[in-house]
Amino acid sequence: MARVSGAAAAEAALMRALYDEHAAVLWRYALRLTGDAAQAEDVVQETLLRAWQHPEVIGDTARPARAWLFTVARNMIIDERRSARFRNVVGSTDQSGTPEQSTPDEVNAALDRLLIADALAQLSAEHRAVIQRSYYRGWSTAQIATDLGIAEGTVKSRLHYAVRALRLTLQELGVTR
């Protein structure tokens, strides 16, 4: 009997550590995607419940638990947005009063924009400036260099490191594509 309670205590300690380490950042992520604090809390609780149901993921040292948690949370939010219940509650209506339905691609695109905006906000001001000018405005390296008053080589270097930092940030948020 002591063996079971010891295993249960170890499992409870593992879940507490998982909660302490990831719940706050997971909640902020879910809040950013949902725009609703209560729904974000529900997403966090359900995500941590799924983590508890899959202890092999938490114990896997090759793959960080945070990436798995963010992926689960994101998928739950996508599933909720795609559901008929969400479309009937939140969706707008056309002239006949029939709810307009978002396509899965529209939902994914909106969530991707939120994720990228969140990741961009975490970059340094210098990296964000070159990313915005290059990828969002379509400026050349020379135009960026002139606008920022830096050498073209510096622009290229900052772009390289900015894209690398953006990729790492998105991976931490659970983006795998």
From Swiss-Prot:
Summary of the knockout phenotype: In a single sigL or double sigL-rslA disruption mutant, no visible phenotype; not more susceptible than the parental strain to several oxidative and nitrosative stresses. Infected BALB/c or DBA/2 mice showed a significantly prolonged survival time relative to mice infected with wild-type bacteria, although bacteria proliferate normally.
State the residue spans of region: Sigma-70 factor domain-2.
18-85
Q: Please name the SUPFAM superfamilies in this protein's record.
A: Sigma2 domain of RNA polymerase sigma factors, Sigma3 and sigma4 domains of RNA polymerase sigma factors
**What triggers its expression?**
Expressed during growth in culture; expression increases from lag to exponential phase. Has a weak SigL-independent promoter, is also weakly autoregulated, no other sigma factor allows its transcription. Forms an operon with rslA.
Where does motif Interaction with polymerase core subunit RpoC map? 42-45
The record's annotation in PROSITE patterns points to:
SIGMA70_ECF (PS01063)
Keywords in alphabetical order: DNA-binding, Sigma factor, Transcription, Transcription regulation, Virulence
Record's subunit section: Interacts transiently with the RNA polymerase catalytic core formed by RpoA, RpoB, RpoC and RpoZ (2 alpha, 1 beta, 1 beta' and 1 omega subunit) to form the RNA polymerase holoenzyme that can initiate transcription. Interacts (via sigma-70 factor domain-4) with anti-sigma-L factor RslA.
Regarding protein family, the annotation reads: Belongs to the sigma-70 factor family. ECF subfamily.
Indicate what this protein is called per its UniProt record: ECF RNA polymerase sigma factor SigL
Which species is this UniProt entry from?
Mycobacterium tuberculosis (strain ATCC 25618 / H37Rv)
This protein's encoding gene: sigL
